[in-house]
Amino acid sequence: MISRMEKMTMMMKILIMFALGMNYWSCSGFPVYDYDPSSLRDALSASVVKVNSQSLSPYLFRAFRSSLKRVEVLDENNLVMNLEFSIRETTCRKDSGEDPATCAFQRDYYVSTAVCRSTVKVSAQQVQGVHARCSWSSSTSESYSSEEMIFGDMLGSHKWRNNYLFGLISDESISEQFYDRSLGIMRRVLPPGNRRYPNHRHRARINTDFE
């Protein structure tokens, strides 16, 4: 049986070896970067700003859950942060000039929610560049699934709206989808003799040119 004293001696040796090993790595050129926690907050804030600049939603998005996935140290003053965060539409409109962090979340059942990932370059404690991309969370998809099963093509896929909010589908394409879907519903619901199709020549066109 190993006595208590021997156990304590063994633990002390392990701790000393661990401390010496850490000291060896730091002295041998292993990158050590003690960044300010405010840099993480700035990186998240810059990521949300980037998402809002890319979104076509009239409302601002706000982060409500975030985590730091990885930190890549480039040198003493430069690093790259990989963040993952969830966003949700707020009650503040884009043209309000409000800080998204101060805006209340929308409480609508169909409020848009997404999971985003961003890569943020930080130099001398300042954000220098941000790349962000988002995908719609499973909870958002599930909230639509039951309605789609009940109403079918009357609701259609929710993906068109989600893609529109992040600029993946133009206004004109959305108009085409609504028009084609309405024709499909009329063909199934109305008898052949009672069908009255909208006049193609009088359909409004939406200007999709952006500055």
From Swiss-Prot:
Major location (coarse): secreted
Places the protein is found: Secreted
Domain of life: Eukaryota
Position of the signal peptide: 1-29
Record keywords: Disulfide bond, Phosphoprotein, Secreted, Signal
Record PTM Phosphoserine, positions in chain: 96, 145-146, 170, 173, 182
One GO BP: bone remodeling
Tissue expression profile of the protein: Detected in liver and plasma.
InterPro entries the record matches: Cystatin_sf, Spp-24
Family listed: Belongs to the SPP2 family.
Name used for this protein in its record: Secreted phosphoprotein 24
Organism: Homo sapiens (Human)
Upper classification of the organism: Eukaryota, Metazoa, Chordata, Craniata, Vertebrata
Protein's gene: SPP2
